[in-house]
Amino acid sequence: MNLHEYQAKALFAEYGLPVSEGFACDTPQEAVEAAGRIGGDMWVVKCQVHAGGRGKAGGVKVTGSKDEIRAFAEHWLGKNLVTYQTDEKGQPVAKILVESCTDIANELYLGAVVDRSTRRVVFMASTEGGVEIETVAEETPELIHKAIIDPLTGPQPYQARDLGFKLGLNPTQMKQFTKVFMGLAKMFEDHDFALLEINPLVITDEGNIHCLDGKIGIDGNALFRQEKIRDMHDPSQDDAREAHAAKFELNYVALDGNVGCMVNGAGLAMGTMDIVNLHGGKPANFLDVGGGATKERVAEAFKIILSDDNVKAVLVNIFGGIVRCDMIAEGIIGAVKEVGVTVPVVVRLEGTNADLGRDVLASSDLDIIAATSLTDAAEQVVKAAEGK
């Protein structure tokens, strides 16, 4: 689950971190009134969506005119913002953040993630603020400095000072940076974050550290104990198919290919996507139906996959462990009949009663291709998607 910028900054403020005064607004009139409450003669207005690249897409504006604030809000509220991080439809804009304008002397980067290789929370800092951290990691990795948080001792001030020295901060800024670092580390643990980014973390003209942006991702598995964070969820930013899949306990992630994938088990699903890619295809989705591949769940999975108009063929890859393959085959046949699948369907079954399952598929009067191996399945579905 992701948070909007205004929600992230509200959390920053709760932990005593320096953020701009701002208000999230639902209407153009509210946006104009917010500028009046903030005061001054320059403001920043930002579309609130769960995507980066807003500035390049016209979703951020610096202005000294309340009329321009009104026009910006009238233009964007209720519309979709398309950036390089969204699909072609973009993300709906329901709120506009109006903030005081900050004069910037220098831009830095500060972020934290759960690093699986070290099994620790790792903070990253860089002098290359305002740039995608992935770009920095690829082109100039030596400019990314890290601090690994030991879960037994927690974050330590010396780690913040070490990062601060590498960022070239002066003693006053070092103290401010240490406060930000310690506050973010506590916030990360308190609220079960999976990702945290401040890009850019700026040094103002007065020489002070300031959190100019905020990006937060929450571990969805921890939401049961994060009621406050859970209430911040904005369903309008979710992919409609992913949200529908979650209702049926299906793990679905939309992609941009033309081969629909239905698999039981996350590891097998990722392996299936890899082998489809290996044979020249492009997966249209990740979909894990879990351990209970029942007719009902398979039917819903087909409906979700086929709601994507780009899907030209479907690969069903099931390992029968607890559930027998012949029962799974009957479920697939029933689901195909119920949904009215019109694209080619390739099925690969392995495990308990796999041969019997393939016989069940072969004896049906449906156009279902029973593959003999995973390689065969990938080759068949890629050909089918290409119309061969």
Swiss-Prot record:
GO terms for cellular component: cytosol; succinate-CoA ligase complex. Binds 1 Mg(2+) ion per subunit. GO terms for molecular function: ATP binding; magnesium ion binding; succinate-CoA ligase (ADP-forming) activity; succinate-CoA ligase (GDP-forming) activity. Belongs to the succinate/malate CoA ligase beta subunit family. Signal peptide: none annotated. Pathway: Carbohydrate metabolism; tricarboxylic acid cycle; succinate from succinyl-CoA (ligase route): step 1/1. The gene is sucC. InterPro entries: ATP-grasp, ATP-grasp_succ-CoA_synth-type, ATP_grasp_subdomain_1, Succ-CoA_synthase_bsu_CS, SUCC_ACL_C, Succ_CoA_ligase-like_bsu, Succinyl-CoA_synth-like. Residues 9-244 form the ATP-grasp domain. ATP binds at K46, G53, R54, G55, E99, T102, E107. Succinyl-CoA synthetase functions in the citric acid cycle (TCA), coupling the hydrolysis of succinyl-CoA to the synthesis of either ATP or GTP and thus represents the only step of substrate-level phosphorylation in the TCA. The beta subunit provides nucleotide specificity of the enzyme and binds the substrate succinate, while the binding sites for coenzyme A and phosphate are found in the alpha subunit. GO terms for biological process: succinyl-CoA metabolic process; tricarboxylic acid cycle. HAMAP family: Succ_CoA_beta. Substrate binds at N264, G321, I322, V323. It comes from Shewanella sediminis (strain HAW-EB3). It is an enzyme of class 6 (ligase). Heterotetramer of two alpha and two beta subunits. The keyword Glycoprotein does not apply. It catalyses: succinate + ATP + CoA = succinyl-CoA + ADP + phosphate; GTP + succinate + CoA = succinyl-CoA + GDP + phosphate. Mg(2+) binds at N199, D213. This is Succinate--CoA ligase [ADP-forming] subunit beta. Keywords: ATP-binding, Ligase, Magnesium, Metal-binding, Nucleotide-binding, Tricarboxylic acid cycle. Its EC number is 6.2.1.5. Its cofactor is Mg(2+).
